[in-house]
Amino acid sequence: KIVLNDIDERNFEQIEKDEYSNLQKKILEVNPKSAKDPTVSARKSINQLVKLGFVKTGLRNYHRLSKEYLRAPTSAYRNKLFSLIVGEAANFAANVTNHDGRRHVDFITSTLMRIGSLNKKQIIGLMTIDPENHPKGFIDLDELNLASKNASKNSFFERKYNQVSYLCNVLNKLEDLTFHDSKLFFDEDARRL
């Protein structure tokens, strides 16, 4: 809410360095952190909003459903809005200063539609792929298995453990997706198991 209000107060202008520092302070006033440098936590929180698609790079705008998400009267509606926002706008390579047009969640779900299920190793493989290099918007099973094998060789999971866990957590929160026996499925497909 603080970030969205800040965007409104700045009339949807790109955030300046001093404004960004003030925004971090506002966040820490509401949600204090006891870390050595609490502003790191505030910056991570802001970047998470950008990566999930709630807020745009430069903190000059937000997703059309972000305020509705904050006002959602029920958890079910909030979960629905989360899925819509993340599905439409999530970009895990974006941050406050750098825009990145790739739509990772859309790429993952499009691949899942064609493969049926994704194990953690395959999800890790997908994390190493640039969706922009695949104009079809998905990859087939052979490409995915090759990417997974290469990620395994490069110790991607060990180096990116937190990011892998974060992505799996986000995917599990999306409407119509679920993990069953450590594999990602569409809910409808998982119910048939």
Segment roles from a protein language model:
Residues 1-193:
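Donor-sugar nucleotide-binding helix/loop cap in glycosyltransferases
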